Amino acid sequence: MKRIALFGGTGKTGKEFLQKALENEYHIKVLARSPEKVDTQSPHLEVIKGDVLNPAEVNATVTGTDIAVSLFGHVKGSPKWLQSDGTSNILSAMLDHGVEKIISLSGGGLPFHKDEPKFADKAIRLIMKVAVPKVLNDAIRHAEILKDSDRKWVIVRGPRLTEEPEKGNYRVGWVGVNASTSIGRADLADFILKQVEEDT
């Protein structure tokens, strides 16, 4: 069973992923600025107090693992390049410890060349550019950092997130083509875990 280095495990989606991964008997090392927010207990869980912007603490989290899962994101007061700099730290630690693959969660506003955004999609992206340019620019930059790395990577772009119970069925695709416009966090966590299980 793969050992997971988890970043962002105390957020709403992170908690869903952590619980599901532990239920599937994965061993997890989670980095948390506030370890008390990790309200799950398991012999397969190790919690490390630290910050994704601290290279040494990221390195300690990645050591002894097989794959990195990055679910952290901006909150009020976050540094401008939180996702980019945190991702760079994770990639550096992965290189040090021979970890080959990272899965990174981002928002549906992150553009991709296979997207065919409809009017509503374009409107949402325009709103993001105006309302939260820091978040969108950081997401774009973090994607470029992943693309320029020599690690295997998967970027999961989540649409509007809901708190509905897990359904077990959801659509995956490109914006405006065949992707869902919303998804429950539990189903999103399920999809992310499936990417952990994939070998490519």
What is the meaning of each model-derived region?
Residues V62, D66-V69, I103:
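N-terminal Rossmann-like NAD(P) cofactor-binding module of classical short-chain dehydrogenase/reductase
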Residues P43-T65:
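Conserved Rossmann-fold cofactor-binding substructure of NAD(P)-dependent oxidoreductases
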Residues T87, D138, V156, S180-L193:
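Substrate-positioning beta->alpha
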Residues I4-N24:
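N-terminal Rossmann NAD(P)H-binding glycine-rich loop of SDR-like oxidoreductase domains
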Residues A143-E164:
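Conserved beta-loop-beta element that borders a ligand/cofactor-binding pocket
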Residues L31-E36, D51-V52:
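N-terminal Rossmann-fold cofactor-binding loop
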Residues P165-G168, Q195-T200:
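Glycine/proline-rich active-site loop of Rossmann-fold NAD(P)-dependent oxidoreductases
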